[in-house]
């Protein structure tokens, strides 16, 4: 498992409840750009799309792969929403827990799995209060 991008701030801002590994729907040039470490994870947001009944990864900035010709991908938008691949049962569990208990879905890291697929590790997490962050800082 090779980690391609990591959200270090999430460790400080959130308490973990559960973790999930989700696949991503990417095109071939986006996969190559991710494997070349050309994407950042700090601004990512995960939202639920009620029309498609799926989770979307928003603000994932993947620039065009350097060796790709512009004519092969006309009108490419680097920050378009990308769909997360999870079971419907997992999606309903995540959405229900965010609505019921006030937890948030946080993307933690982008990694290449053993089968050479690009995946995202996501947390179901609780936001820490400012006082809890200070206590955590003094302990560490």
For the regions a protein language model found, what residue spans apply to each?
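Ribosome large-subunit tunnel/peptidyl-transferase-proximal elements
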Residues: 2-103
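RNA pseudouridine synthases
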Residues: 3, 24, 122-123, 132
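Alpha-helix boundary/interfacial micro-motifs
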Residues: 45-46, 70, 106, 118-119, ...
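Beta-rich strand-turn-strand
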Residues: 85-129
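Conserved small/polar residues in nucleotide/adenosyl-binding loops
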Residues: 139-140
